[in-house]
A protein has these predicted regions:
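Domain-level signature for proteins that mediate thiol-based redox and metal-cofactor handling
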Residues: 1-104
Length: 104
């Protein structure tokens, strides 16, 4: 990756932070649901998971992540790959999400 694609990947990650998990009310980045973001030749590739394989919000989250990535200037196409390896756990959340969920 080049410095430009690294910067664009960082922009995509910031855009993904606007996608809120409807069940937990926190964004997918802080929840640790985004495993990888890469951009090459205007194509954003996002690898993500959900909290459980049977998550009822899976389709919504995948579509919202794709739309958020695609909305970043310089991204001409966005691919989202859903994976359950490694399996998500609450330990993957950052401190902000953990604190917000603990206060509810």
């Amino acid at each position: 990756m080049t410095a430009g694609s690294d910067a664009l990947a960082a922009e995509v990650r910031r855009a993904l932070a606007l996608v809120i998990d409807p069940e937990l009310g926190e964004n997918v980045v802080d929840l640790g649901l985004i495993y990888a973001v890469a951009v090459e030749d205007g194509v954003a590739r996002v690898e993500m998971t959900t909290t459980t394989p049977g998550c009822p919000a899976t389709a919504f989250l995948k579509e919202a992540v794709q739309a958020a990535a695609w909305g970043v200037p310089g991204v001409h196409y966005a691919e989202v790959k859903l994976t359950y390896e490694p399996k998500w756990s609450p330990a993957m959340m950052n401190e902000v999400a953990r604190r917000n969920l603990d206060s509810r």
